[in-house]
UniProtKB/Swiss-Prot annotation:
InterPro entries hit by this protein: bZIP_sf (IPR046347), Fungal_TF_Env_Response (IPR051430), Transcription_factor_dom_fun (IPR007219), Zn2-C6_fun-type_DNA-bd_sf (IPR036864), Zn2Cys6_DnaBD (IPR001138)
Binding site for Zn(2+) 2: C64, C81, C84, C93
Gene3D superfamilies registered for this protein in UniProt: 1.20.5.170, Zn(2)-C6 fungal-type DNA-binding domain
Protein name: Heme-responsive zinc finger transcription factor HAP1
Principal place of residence: nucleus
Compositionally biased tracts (Polar residues): 1-50, 143-152, 160-176, 432-447, 706-734, 1388-1411
Places the protein is found: Nucleus
Record's function text: Regulation of oxygen dependent gene expression. It modulates the expression of Iso-1 (CYP1) and Iso-2 (CYP3) cytochrome c. In response to heme, promotes transcription of genes encoding functions required for respiration, controlling oxidative damage and repression of anaerobic genes. Binds to the sequence 5'-CGGNNNTNNCGG-3'. Is non-functional in terms of iso-1 cytochrome c expression in strain S288c and its derivatives.
GO molecular function, one term: zinc ion binding
Length: 1483
């Protein structure tokens, strides 16, 4: 026993085992007859009936669990025996705790605790000396935080504790030698880590120089999403935070938003002038036959006299420009009187407010001329009225009819032309599903049955019997249910291990009577049919004997649904082309026999035929469980089973997000995927946490001895099965969760013994049931803790369960006294709980420094470096997870109150395996948890066939992705902090490049792992078998985060250095280097050569920042491949739609313009006069939002909030940003700090931009940029310089048809300017505040001859866009316009003659002599000027498609603004409606 690696006190404990078993007074054992000496031998007369009842000892075995399972001899070595080591399962070597050894274990725990305290004291002393030796005095401020003060106070207490116990632990000399050895080892490790992190001694000194630099993460990476119904906070770990933290993305978004605003203005003016020239009724009469339309008795009910000639009616009386749902040809002479006879009938009888509520009439349907049925087919619309209300305003329709006609049912004039019966049958579902059951739409290829519940209408309330009868029809046959449950516990259970398998299966047997089918019990304890002929035996009755069985039924439905979705055949088919072979991982199908593969294929084909509809879960949670009431109102019926159902419900909502439109009752139209970023999950998790507190899960069950006393009562209650009334003296939680297990054990011991509490066998079974219940208790609590950490990491929100050990003493599931010899997979679950909790502690340490305001406000560089090094050691396998957690605690990065010291006796052999070992496990047949020892082939043959091993390895794979995503985030934060400092401190350039390279490496690693996952999910028996639904969103989210950093680097590689917002414009007007023919030819040739090199590119290799000019092309190829992936995944996963649109947006935006596309029409390819609005399905529509939506967008606020005010730098270009008036009004009068000019880390001497090649391009500049003549000053002002505004007004002013109320404060009203002033500042970008609801009634411009001549002399584009950027100089504020009582302006034509007689065309009268080809349209010049983003030539044609335009007013009508968020638009095939009041109306 001397060669054992375990502690020296263990052999003494093991040696006293056999001698102490029989005489220890503390052992709860019962010796069998004949086991003692002859003096204790039983009498001879006990040989008949009494000898049948044998008493078994409650002896805890000494051998490990694995050896007893394999039935081999165990050498009982600690921490793992030799047999387990040879077999390759040393990580599972587990010994049951001896009850008499608790005192000895406590002594061991004390020694281990003292050892950890000594290590922590030394680490704190080292940190304190480092701080004192630092020359910076500001670094000491960060130690004045409450946590740091408690840390040092704790160190003094620990030092006192160590000094008090040192003499009892060991001698002083031995302690001194041990400390010296540990100090030497730590110094060597620190030196090696520093050497690996820095290439030479100079870089090491540079790193040490900036170690105490402080970073403020509370301002750079915090977002607030302002929605129409509230706000959502998005922290530094959210995927949108990178858009705020990166300066290049911030400037790009500002440029894009400005472009979008300009383009929308052009769209509006074009549509306004098209209405101005065509004086038509807003009601489309094209559907009526010509003969019927010409009849005098069938005139339009709209009063055309309300309109001025050629003008659109006022908004409050004008129906929105859509097709009128009333067929105007169907009215006979007795229905609608002619307009001449009835002067009071001046309004359309259709209530057009219904349009704003969401009803869209059909576009192509032609109704019958004289039909009285509905002209609206509600079944063809995706947007129906929210209530069954007729769109015809009956008050306006029937007010002129006599009473006898109105009451006559035979008179056709008394009937509404809308068929109300069809409206009742096709009424839209309300936002809340309290009245109807949503209809199930099975996916393509589904073999789901047609259930009556999907075709019938349900009342507002269904009785329990009706719900159960409907569920019986929805559930699959009995044998299929048993197969689904078996598949779940074999493949999916490790992802959500909060159930007791035996207990749950017994509950299912009781509810569905699966044991009545001549069952044969399989290895899992589930009753299975003995013949395949019973395959189609349906569920005829559902028994719910207890209240908690409703929750068990809900869990069963989630399991059936989730398992069906997770079948490999249901996964999305991904074809990446030639790159697919790079992302393949070996599978284990070669190790399976042909018969096993055939049997597996038959089972999957059987399961595919039986899909459980999502409506079954809705019925159960709404009518049986009443989950909304339980989670929000009352906790009377909350028990352990209720918490389990809530966790399963939350898990299902995140995994199967496509069903959220049916399951959720909240309206999340503003989010593309309400299943992951929505705040509804935050509320649900908070409810789960509070229910756990209500049940007492935060306290360990060993603290409550009364749990042991409830078993006899529970057993008796279950034996008398059939009544829902529970014993009032029985704990309801135990009654609901342990009854089935007790019933099963009691039935095996006989009915007489089950009613007898004196039976020792029954006592033992009861004890086992108690331990299994406590085990489930602990598993649920730590799973909630893990959910809290994952949500905080995903959304960047603070954790709910902070400082866990301050209020919870629940032990890990490994503390449960359970014999796992019959359930090895539960042993793996227990090991995973311990490992995953330790990984969560590492994540908590990172989240504390990023999200906690007290730490994130002044976090230091060396703290982030320590976190990076420890996480790298963990994911690369160079350090055990126990050592990593200990290092975090010793360095003060993780407080002990988070639970770091909860596992002092953890298995060091069970750690996170290396990622290559996980992926290559099937190919090389390597030991996944090898401890470095070589194993022979004979040992491999003896290896135990472990259950759900592939699922466990898939979970390990996801943990690696999470850790490496944190490493990417930490390096990115440091990179963005030090990159702008390079211009002031050149020493930071080395640090910035190192952090950028590390961030790129981890970003590419996440990108590759995402591709590996989706490229292997359909492979049979692969690593990700049955994990396609559970891991799809986490993998795709990490891939999406990686692409954001790729975009940042592409911008740096193409744009070059930033010049700084306060120094000069980042948008150079008129730069045409990208349109020079010779330059274009050279760019095309370089692009072709680089594309040939990319064909040979290996996507599995890392990308080097020193790749030069090919860096952007290499990264672009990654983006294209990811776009291809998300496009294929969009067919199955809704959240892939948002990511596909985001990727497609940047791909289109950063695409290099080619010469062919620019010269197709002789240099006029950007002439968009005939250009039509593209289809939404072919463009990125997420930027199509109105003013209110844009101002709520966090990226918009951050992108445009830092722009310097106009006039601060007169040399700045007018395209640079918004005016002072608009900017300060939006941002509350505050300005974000300016962005400093600096060179990016990708900038090299060979990467110079061709910004100086402007000689020839300047000569070709259009005369639009030469200058303009100001009538007020008669001075030529260069086009690139904005005139200084007078009277404090900005050079950018509101449009002609609307003006800001800030200009009315002085009592002056602007007059109508001339066209010279209208076009004088066409290049200036107006702010969003120019769009107001104030309207000005102007005379009809079509009546003015000069105005008409100027229109004729312009191109269609010019006439449509000439008033897009109207400037109202202060000289025009002379009060020539008066406001009438209605709030509209009337032009005083008597004072100035004709108000529009002085209007001239742009550039004065010279325009009349110029042709349309000599003068380019405004939009073209605008796009040409703004296609240059800091040297990056953005393709204007793709920019129009990417940014999107002003939506056609004919499609307007909804007044509920969709919450705007970039790349978040649900309606990919429908137009996003604007709020009509935000755009002016021309009259």
């Amino acid at each position: 026993m001397s060669n054992t690696p375990y502690n020296s006190s263990v052999p003494s404990i093991a040696s006293m085992t056999q001698s102490s078993v029989s005489r220890s007074p503390n052992m709860h054992t019962a010796t069998t007859p004949g086991a003692n000496t002859s003096s204790n031998s039983p009498p001879l007369h006990m040989s008949s009936d009494s000898s049948k009842i044998k008493r078994k000892r409650n002896r805890i075995p000494l051998s490990c669990t694995i050896c007893r399972k394999r039935k081999v001899k165990c050498d009982k070595l600690r921490p793992h025996c030799q047999q387990c080591t040879k077999t390759g399962v040393a990580h599972l070597c587990h010994y049951m705790e001896q009850t008499w050894a608790e005192e000895a274990e406590k002594e061991l725990l004390k020694d281990n605790e003292l050892k950890k305290l000594r290590e922590r004291v030394k680490s704190l002393e080292k940190t304190l000396s480092k701080v004192h030796s630092s020359p910076s005095s500001n670094s000491l401020k960060s130690y004045n935080t409450p946590e740091s003060s408690n840390l040092f106070m704790g160190s003094d207490e620990h030092t006192t504790l160590v000094n008090a116990n040192t003499g009892s632990a060991s001698s002083a000399s031995h302690m001194h030698q041990q400390q010296q050895q540990q100090q030497q080892q730590e110094q060597q490790q620190d030196f090696s880590r520093s050497a690996n992190a820095n290439a030479n001694s100079s870089s090491l000194s540079i790193s040490n120089k900036y170690d105490n630099d402080e970073l403020d993460l509370t301002k750079d990476f915090d977002l607030l999403h302002i929605k129409s119904n509230g706000t959502i906070h998005l922290g530094a770990t959210h995927w949108l935070s990178i858009m705020k933290g990166d300066p290049y993305l911030k400037l790009l978004w500002g440029h894009i938003f400005a472009m979008r605003e300009k383009l929308n203005e052009w769209y509006y003016q074009k549509n306004s002038y098209s209405k101005l020239k065509s004086s038509k009724c807003p009601i489309n009469h094209a559907q009526a036959p010509p003969s019927a339309a010409a009849a005098a008795t069938r005139k339009c009910p709209v009063d055309h006299s309300a309109f001025s000639s050629g003008m659109v009616a006022p908004k409050e009386e004008t129906p929105l420009p859509r097709k009128c749902p009333v067929d105007h040809t169907m009215f006979s002479s007795g229905m609608i009187p002619p307009r001449e006879d009835t002067s009071s009938q001046k309004r359309c009888p259709v209530d057009h407010t219904m349009y704003s509520a969401g009803m869209m009439p059909p576009k192509d349907e032609t109704p019958s001329p004289f039909s009285t049925k509905a002209m609206i087919d509600h079944n063809k619309h995706t947007m129906n009225p929210p209530q069954s209300k007729c769109p015809v305003d009956h008050r306006n329709y029937m007010k002129d009819y006599p009473s006898d006609m109105a009451n006559s049912s035979s008179n056709p004039a008394s009937r509404c032309p809308i068929d109300h019966s069809s409206m009742k049958n096709t009424a839209a579902l309300p936002a809340s599903t309290h009245n109807t059951i949503p209809h199930h739409q099975p996916q393509s290829g589904s073999h789901a049955r047609s259930h009556p519940a999907q075709s019938r209408k349900h009342d507002s309330y269904m009785t329990e019997s009706e719900v159960l009868a409907t569920l019986c029809e929805m559930l699959p046959p009995k044998r299929v249910i048993a197969l689904f449950i078996e598949k779940f516990f074999k493949h999916l259970y490790p992802a959500i291990p909060i159930l007791d398998e035996q207990n749950f299966k017994n509950h299912v047997n009781q509810m569905l009577s699966l044991s009545s089918m001549n069952p044969t019990v399989n290895n899992f304890g589930m009753s299975m049919p003995s013949s395949s002929t019973l395959e189609n035996q349906p569920i005829t009755q559902i028994n719910l004997p207890k209240l908690s069985d409703s929750c068990n039924l809900g869990i069963l439905i989630i399991i059936l649904r989730l398992t069906w979705l997770s079948i490999p055949s249901n996964s999305c088919e991904v074809d990446l082309g030639e790159e697919s072979g790079s992302f393949l991982v070996p599978n284990e199908s070669s190790n399976m026999s042909a018969s096993a593969l055939t049997s597996m294929a038959k089972e999957e084909s059987l399961l595919l035929k039986h899909e459980t509809p999502v409506e079954a879960l809705e019925l159960c949670q709404k009518y049986l469980i009443k989950f909304d009431e339980l989670s929000s109102i009352s906790n009377n019926n909350v028990n352990l089973t209720t918490v389990q159902f809530a966790i399963f419900y939350n898990f299902y909502m995140k995994s199967a997000s496509n069903d959220l439109t049916t399951l959720t009752n909240t309206n999340n139209t503003g989010m593309a995927n309400p299943g992951h970023d929505s705040e509804s999950h935050q509320i649900l998790l908070s409810n789960i946490t509070q229910m756990a507190f209500s049940c007492g899960l935060h306290r360990d069950p060993d603290n409550f001895p009364q749990l042991n006393a409830t078993i006899p009562a529970t057993s008796q209650d279950v034996s008398n099965n059939g009544s829902k009334k529970a014993n009032p003296s029985t704990n309801p939680t135990l009654n609901n969760n342990m009854s089935a297990a007790t019933t099963n054990s009691s039935s095996r011991s006989g009915s007489a013994d089950s009613r007898s509490g004196s039976n020792p066998v029954n006592k033992k079974e009861n004890q086992v049931s108690i331990e299994r219940f406590k085990h489930t208790w602990r598993k649920i609590w730590y799973y909630i803790v893990s959910m809290d950490v994952n949500q905080s990491l995903s959304l960047g929100s603070p954790r709910l369960l902070r400082n866990l050990r301050d209020f919870s003493d629940t032990k890990l599931p490994s503390a449960s006294r359970i014999d796992y010899v019959r359930d090895i997979k539960e042993l793996i679950i227990v090991k995973n709980f311990t490992l995953f909790f330790q990984i969560d502690l590492c994540i908590i340490a990172v989240l504390n420094h990023i999200l906690n305001v007290s730490l994130a406000r002044s976090v230091r560089k060396f703290e982030l470096d320590s976190l990076i090094n420890l996480l790298k050691n963990l994911t690369y396998g160079t350090e055990n997870v126990n050592d990593v957690v200990s290092s975090l605690i010793n360095k003060g990065l993780l407080p002990t109150s988070e639970g770091g010291s909860v596992d002092s006796n953890n298995d060091e052999i069970y750690g996170l395996p290396k990622l290559p070992d996980i992926l290559n496990h099937g190919q090389h047949n390597q030991n996944l948890y090898a401890d470095g020892r070589n194993t022979s082939s004979s040992d491999i043959d003896k290896k135990l066939d472990l259950p759900h091993e592939s699922t466990t390895r898939a979970l390990f794979f996801s943990k690696h992705m999470t850790i490496r995503m944190l490493l990417y985030l930490l390096n990115y934060i440091l990179f963005t902090h030090y990159e702008p400092m390079g211009s002031e401190d050149p020493g930071t350039n080395i640090l910035a490049k190192e952090y950028a390279q590390e961030a790129l490496n981890f970003a590419m690693d996440g990108y590759r792992n995402c591709m590996i996952f989706f490229n292997n999910i359909r492979n049979t028996n692969s690593l990700f078998d049955y994990m396609n639904v559970i891991l799809s969103y986490p993998c795709l989210d990490i891939g999406h985060r990686s692409l954001q950093f790729i975009v940042c680097l592409i911008l740096r590689a193409k744009c070059g250095p930033l010049t700084g917002m306060r120094e000069s414009s980042i948008i150079t007007n008129g730069t045409s280097s990208g349109f020079n023919s010779s330059v274009e030819d050279e760019d095309v040739k370089v692009k072709q050569e680089s594309s040939d090199e990319l064909k040979k590119d290996d996507f599995m290799k890392d990308v080097n920042l020193d790749s030069g000019d090919s860096l952007a092309e290499i990264l672009m190829s990654r983006m294209l491949l990811f776009q291809k992936l998300t496009k294929q995944l969009s067919k199955k996963y809704n959240y892939a739609i948002r990511m596909n649109k985001s990727t497609g947006f940047f791909v289109s935006l950063l695409d290099t313009p080619s010469k062919k596309s620019d010269s197709k029409s002789g240099g006029s390819s950007f002439m968009l006069g005939n250009w039509k609005h593209p289809k939404v399905s072919n463009m990125s529509g997420f930027l199509a939002g109105d003013k209110d939506q844009l101002q709520k967008c966090p990226v918009y606020q951050d992108a445009l909030g830092f722009v310097s005010p106009t006039g601060a730098n007169e040399g700045s270009a007018p395209m640079q940003g918004m005016s002072l008036q608009g900017s300060t009004a939006r941002m509350g009068g505050t300005q974000l700090p300016p962005i400093r000019s600096y060179k990016p880390i990708t900038y090299t001497s060979s990467n110079l931009r061709r910004m100086n090649e402007t000689g020839e391009a300047e000569a070709k500049r259009r005369r639009f940029n030469d200058g303009y003549i100001d009538n007020n000053s008669n001075n030529d002002i260069p086009r690139g310089i904005s005139p200084k505004p007078s009277n404090g007004l900005s050079s950018v002013q509101p449009l002609l048809s609307s003006f800001s109320m800030n200009q009315l404060n002085g009592g002056t009203i602007p007059t109508v300017p001339s066209l010279t002033n209208i076009t004088s500042q066409m290049g200036a970008l107006p702010s969003l505040d120019r769009i107001t609801t104030n309207q000005i009634n102007l005379p009809d411009p079509s009546r003015d001859e000069a105005f008409d001549n100027s229109i004729k002399q312009m191109t269609p584009m010019t006439s449509a866009f000439m008033n897009a950027n109207t400037t109202i100089p202060s000289s025009t504020l002379n009060g020539n316009m008066n406001m009438n009582g209605a709030g509209t302006a009337n032009t005083d034509t008597s004072a100035n003659g004709s108000a529009l007689s002085t209007l001239t065309s742009p550039q004065g009268s010279d325009l009349a002599s110029n042709s349309a080809t000599q003068y380019k349209p405004d939009l073209e010049d605008f796009l040409m000027q703004n296609s240059n983003f800091n040297g990056l030539m953005i393709n204007p044609s793709s920019l129009v498609e990417v940014v999107g335009g002003y939506n056609d007013p004919n499609n307007l009508g909804r007044n509920d603004a969709v919450d705007f968020l970039p790349v978040d638009n649900v309606e990919i095939d429908g137009l996003v409606d604007f709020y009509r009041a935000d755009f002016p109306i021309w009259e």
